[in-house]
């Protein structure tokens, strides 16, 4: 980044660009969350399951996010690791109403946290305990317990209860992530 670029970021004329990986099992609501974070005139009306990955952009008050929305289908999860080096933050989405697949989500999270490109970095991780509007949903505290999030000691993390369709809980998460990105060097 050149001197003028740095100066424009400091003065707030240009937003710092951040690469974020959006991970989680299929049907957890990753694409719906990312879509809801975009300006209303840029949101898609029909959300389809992501095949492979897609790249989406949205802005917060001081950052410009480039989000790699990674497919959570089993056959595509091995692609995640190819993007770990580039990621400056992670959004991990969990379907809080799907207790049966919580074990699989924990396995994928453990694999992520132990990967060499992630393990030794203080990369912030935002967890969305999504689909809180559904009758079978467990609380974000219970999701945290089921995923053993308290064992994550070397990375800043935060969990937010969310309802991606209504947009509830999303801004809280993005605000936390923005604060972490601005203070944590990955």
Curated annotation (Swiss-Prot):
It is found in: Cell projection, Cilium membrane; Cytoplasm, Cytoskeleton, Cilium axoneme; Cytoplasm, Cytoskeleton, Cilium basal body. Changing residue 169 to A: In BBS3; abrogates the GTP-binding ability; increased proteasomal degradation. It holds the Pfam family Arf. Keywords: Bardet-Biedl syndrome, Cell membrane, Cell projection, Ciliopathy, Cilium biogenesis/degradation, Cytoplasm, Cytoskeleton, Disease variant, GTP-binding, Intellectual disability, Lipoprotein, Magnesium, Membrane, Metal-binding, Myristate, Nucleotide-binding, Obesity, Protein transport, Retinitis pigmentosa, Sensory transduction, Transport, Vision. SMART domains: ARF, SAR. CDD domains: Arl6. PROSITE patterns: ARF. InterPro entries: Arl6 (IPR041839), P-loop_NTPase (IPR027417), Small_GTP-bd (IPR005225), Small_GTPase_ARF (IPR024156), Small_GTPase_ARF/SAR (IPR006689). GO terms for molecular function: GTP binding; GTPase activity; metal ion binding; phospholipid binding. A lipid is attached at residue 2 (N-myristoyl glycine). GO terms for cellular component: axonemal microtubule; axoneme; cilium; cytoplasm; cytosol; extracellular exosome; intracellular membrane-bounded organelle; membrane. It is a peripheral membrane protein. GTP binds at residues 24-31, 50, 69-73, 130-133, 164. Mg(2+) binds at residues 31, 50. Gene3D superfamilies: P-loop containing nucleotide triphosphate hydrolases. SUPFAM superfamilies: P-loop containing nucleoside triphosphate hydrolases. One of its GO terms (biological process) is melanosome transport. Interacts with SEC61B, ARL6IP1, ARL6IP2, ARL6IP3, ARL6IP4 ARL6IP5 and ARL6IP6. Interacts (GTP-bound form) with the BBSome a complex that contains BBS1, BBS2, BBS4, BBS5, BBS7, BBS8/TTC8, BBS9 and BBIP10. Interacts (GTP-free form) with IFT27. Involved in membrane protein trafficking at the base of the ciliary organelle. Mediates recruitment onto plasma membrane of the BBSome complex which would constitute a coat complex required for sorting of specific membrane proteins to the primary cilia. Together with BBS1, is necessary for correct trafficking of PKD1 to primary cilia. Together with the BBSome complex and LTZL1, controls SMO ciliary trafficking and contributes to the sonic hedgehog (SHH) pathway regulation. May regulate cilia assembly and disassembly and subsequent ciliary signaling events such as the Wnt signaling cascade. It is linked to Bardet-Biedl syndrome 3: A syndrome characterized by usually severe pigmentary retinopathy, early-onset obesity, polydactyly, hypogenitalism, renal malformation and intellectual disability. Secondary features include diabetes mellitus, hypertension and congenital heart disease. Bardet-Biedl syndrome inheritance is autosomal recessive, but three mutated alleles (two at one locus, and a third at a second locus) may be required for clinical manifestation of some forms of the disease. Retinitis pigmentosa 55: A retinal dystrophy belonging to the group of pigmentary retinopathies. Retinitis pigmentosa is characterized by retinal pigment deposits visible on fundus examination and primary loss of rod photoreceptor cells followed by secondary loss of cone photoreceptors. Patients typically have night vision blindness and loss of midperipheral visual field. As their condition progresses, they lose their far peripheral visual field and eventually central vision as well. Belongs to the small GTPase superfamily. Arf family. This is ADP-ribosylation factor-like protein 6. It comes from Homo sapiens (Human). The gene is ARL6.
């Amino acid at each position: 980044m050149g001197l003028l670029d740095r100066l424009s970021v400091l003065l707030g004329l240009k937003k710092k660009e951040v690469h974020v990986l959006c991970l989680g099992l299929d049907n957890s609501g990753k694409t719906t969350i990312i879509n809801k974070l975009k300006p209303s005139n840029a949101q898609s009306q029909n959300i389809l399951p992501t095949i492979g990955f897609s790249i989406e952009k949205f802005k917060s008050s001081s950052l410009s996010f480039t989000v790699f929305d990674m497919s959570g289908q089993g056959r595509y999860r091995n692609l995640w690791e190819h993007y770990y080096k580039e990621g400056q933050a992670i959004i991990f989405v969990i379907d809080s109403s799907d207790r049966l697949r919580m074990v699989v989500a924990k396995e994928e999270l453990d694999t992520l946290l132990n990967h060499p490109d992630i393990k030794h970095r203080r990369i912030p991780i935002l967890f969305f305990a999504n689909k809180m509007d559904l009758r079978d949903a467990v609380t974000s505290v219970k999701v945290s317990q089921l995923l053993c999030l308290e064992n994550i000691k070397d990375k800043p993390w935060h969990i937010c209860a969310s309802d991606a369709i209504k947009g509830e809980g999303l801004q809280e998460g993005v605000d936390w992530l923005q604060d972490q990105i601005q203070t944590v060097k990955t």
